[in-house]
Amino acid sequence: MAAAPPPPPPLLLLLLCVCAVFADVPIGTQPEQVHISYPGVQNSMLVTWSSANKTDSVVEYGLWGGKLFSHSATGNSSIFINEGAEYRVMYIHRVLLTDLRPAASYVYHCGSGAGWSELFFFTALNESVFFSPGFALFGDLGNENPQSLSRLQKETQIGTYDVILHIGDFAYDLYEDNGRIGDEFMKQIQSIAAYVPYMTCPGNHEWAFNFSQYRARFSMPGDTEGLWYSWNVGPAHIISFSTEVYFYYLEYGLDLLFRQYEWLRADLQEANRPENRAERPWIITMGHRPMYCSNDDDDDCTHFQSYVRLGRNDTKPPAPGLEELFYQYGVDLELWAHEHTYERLWPVYDYKVFNGSSEEPYVNPKAPVHIITGSAGCREKHDGFIPKPRDWSAFRSTDYGYTRLQLINNTHLYLEQVSDDQYGKVIDQMTLVKEKHGPDAWR
């Protein structure tokens, strides 16, 4: 009879025990890519995250300094299948937190009994119209060459911002490598977006598969999967919309373009009701592709006949542009990205400058002010400018960077541009003063 084999070494026994203990633990249940957003409902916050496997959707939270998990909320998850060759599956979880105390700070984590995230914190929206919120504004941020990311992370941690506005173009691109590029990007921005509401609009880099990655990964107010929506904060009504409906209509139809236009008109009409405009006098829009720019890349905004600005006459029926609509309803500030540069415009309408005065151009201007802030950093690097700026171009820079915005009160708004190339130096600033809002302000 053969001799019995020698006993396994202690290390192997330990490994076998560990494997046995974890053999039945599900793989891929850990929450990741956590981010929050305003749902457009007072005293609420929406928490979104993903997991590789299906799990329960739970957020445990409590007031900062109080009992850690005194509240619990449950939500739901939806399956998302990446359209790449691998058809990778992920689950997107959404949980709505309600009855939050305005302006109070909360600690939370998300997940389930199969795995919890680390601890995060946020401040509930201050519902007062006298609230003076601070924003970070940028577009065109990728997971490769994200020049502004580290500075935004630090400023988020020290409480500089109440809201982040990401004005289109994420990751470069969310769908690439069967969605893994999107996963990595969402993990990168978690250090910002899990703490401060991360509000978005779609850009041209989200176009693939009918914007499915953008629609699945982000959670914005309304029922259009974040393609267009509006919300209120402090003295402002903020409108997010898609410029891409003017460019991908052959792939996805004209219906979205006309539906969005009619929604925009109805939303602007409602915002301009006297009682609403008195309460929230500032109307701010955010869309990816600008109406105007002085870049040298032959983009839509470099042409007088910009599709976003004037519409398209090559469609049936013709598609209306947005400049006249925004002017008609007295939009104060229009935020754009797409160009990998920063450009501040003089108050402009119909390609003409309408400064408040030669000495104080941004005091009671007679047209909307446009800001292009698409230089946060991505693999496509910088864009360039034409040598001689247009008459409506007030300041421009090719530095990597982002924009800070402070809504001071009903009449004053402050904006500044931060250069990453110059180690956080403020390279441009503007105070917009509006003693009168609405279309009557243009007269």
From Swiss-Prot:
Glycosites: N53, N76, N126, N210, N313, N355, N409
Residue sites binding Fe cation per the record: D140, D169, Y172, H340
Superkingdom of source: Eukaryota
Record Pfam families: Metallophos, Metallophos_C, Pur_ac_phosph_N
Residue numbers binding Zn(2+): D169, N204, H288, H338
One annotated Gene Ontology cellular component of this protein: extracellular region
Obligatory cofactor(s): Fe cation; Zn(2+)
Bound cofactor: record note: Binds 1 Fe cation per subunit.
Top EC group: hydrolase
CDD domains associated with the record: MPP_PAPs
Molecular function terms, GO-annotated: acid phosphatase activity; metal ion binding
Alphabetic keyword roster: Glycoprotein, Hydrolase, Iron, Metal-binding, Secreted, Signal, Zinc
Reactions it catalyzes: a phosphate monoester + H2O = an alcohol + phosphate
EC number in record: 3.1.3.2
InterPro entries, sorted: Calcineurin-like_PHP_ApaH, Metallo-depent_PP-like, MPP_PAP, Purple_acid_Pase-like_N, Purple_acid_Pase_N, Purple_acid_PPase_C_dom
Family in the record: Belongs to the metallophosphoesterase superfamily. Purple acid phosphatase family.
Protein name: Acid phosphatase type 7
Species whose genome carries this gene: Danio rerio
Organism taxonomic ancestry: Eukaryota, Metazoa, Chordata, Craniata, Vertebrata
